[in-house]
């Protein structure tokens, strides 16, 4: 019977990793709505898969004859720190903020199938080395393939066999977080600006995106920025190292400010002129490629959940772009 994979591995650059296996000539085509259907692989696709372990179409999940299979995946929610006061009359009363602080490990049950007991032993060695060499990587549930969680393995990798000579074993692995406690979108907001969200296999139901094309705007010309965060969480841009704010200035000014929807004010206390370009990439702040963090007020901006209305002060002529990944609980 063909075997299916219920999760997806991505390397640290968010490129899909295909597990080594021996394959049937079939694959499951994963669609953005989470459903899938079986397709036949061409001879050239099957040859590429056997030799390189990859397919040109990243949404094709090859069906394996022998190899490692993710039987199930459980992605728990984040946990909260809730402070209580014990009142004799009212019992425990919640006080203070309910901050999300951690995410329990993501648990995946693997099954390993081999042609005989010797093949099983060799495959165990192969997969141990494969998994231990991953270091930091991303995982996703195949039903939500565009929500990625950055993790690493911090345990022994052992496959339990029902009997010694049976060419089958099972391994339960826990992936611990390696960075943000949240899942993040595989693609960024500028992808939406350039391509929209329809029919491009980059966004899916359940990711919070809207069909309203006004919500696809993340670039603005001489307009106060108004853009949409489709994630379930706010985005502290200083913590998202690949996030980009770009402001191309088309006038002269002695200073300017960018104000986010929470009222946080970023200020550059430096004269600018036409053609100057400010970039904030994570924690790096440059003007025309030169570090200018010392000439700011050291505030970093936050993208709120839902609609964001930002303000550019002391500038009327500019081009503003923002690029970030949505975050999900």
Predicted regions and their residues:
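Polar/acidic, low-complexity leader/linker segments enriched in S/T/G and N/D
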Residues: 1-80
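Surface-exposed loop/edge segments in extracytoplasmic proteins
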Residues: 14-20, 146-150, 263-269
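Intrinsically disordered, low-complexity segments enriched in serine, threonine, and glycine
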Residues: 189-329
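Oligomerization/assembly interface segments of phage tail-like spikes and tubes
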Residues: 90-118, 166-181, 308
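Non-catalytic, solvent-exposed interaction/assembly segments
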Residues: 67, 73-82, 88-93, 103-109
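Solvent-exposed loop and beta-edge segments used for protein-protein assembly and interaction
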Residues: 99-104, 131-133, 165-169, 237-241, ...
């Amino acid at each position: 019977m063909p075997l299916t994979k219920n999760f997806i591995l991505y390397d640290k650059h968010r490129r899909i990793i295909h597990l080594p296996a021996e394959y049937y000539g079939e694959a499951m085509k994963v669609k953005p709505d989470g459903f899938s259907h079986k397709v036949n692989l061409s001879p050239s696709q099957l040859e590429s898969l056997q030799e390189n372990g990859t397919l040109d179409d990243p949404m094709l999940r090859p069906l394996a004859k022998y190899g490692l299979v993710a039987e199930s995946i459980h992605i728990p929610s984040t946990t909260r720190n809730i402070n209580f006061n014990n009142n004799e009359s009212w019992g425990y009363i919640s006080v203070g903020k309910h901050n999300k602080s951690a995410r329990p490990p993501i648990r995946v049950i693997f099954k390993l199938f081999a042609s005989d007991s010797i093949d099983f032993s060799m495959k165990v060695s192969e997969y141990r080395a494969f998994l231990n060499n991953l270091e930091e990587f991303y995982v996703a549930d195949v039903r939500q393939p565009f929500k990625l969680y950055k993790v690493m393995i911090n345990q022994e990798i052992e496959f339990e066999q029902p009997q010694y000579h049976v060419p089958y074993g099972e391994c339960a692995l826990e992936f611990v977080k390696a960075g943000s406690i949240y899942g993040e979108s595989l693609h960024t907001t500028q992808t939406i600006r350039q391509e929209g969200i329809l029919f491009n296999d980059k966004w899916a139901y359940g990711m919070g995106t809207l069909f309203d094309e006004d919500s696809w705007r993340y670039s603005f010309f001489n307009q106060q920025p108004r853009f949409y965060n489709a994630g379930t969480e706010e985005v502290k841009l200083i913590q998202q190292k690949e996030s980009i704010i770009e402001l191309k200035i088309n006038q002269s000014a002695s200073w300017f400010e960018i104000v986010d929807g929470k009222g946080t004010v970023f200020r550059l206390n430096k004269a600018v002129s036409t053609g100057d370009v400010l970039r904030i990439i994570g924690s790096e702040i440059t003007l025309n490629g030169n570090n200018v963090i010392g000439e700011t007020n050291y505030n970093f901006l936050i993208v709120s959940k839902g609609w964001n209305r930002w303000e550019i002060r002391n500038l009327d002529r500019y081009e503003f772009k923002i690029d970030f990944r949505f975050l999900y609980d």
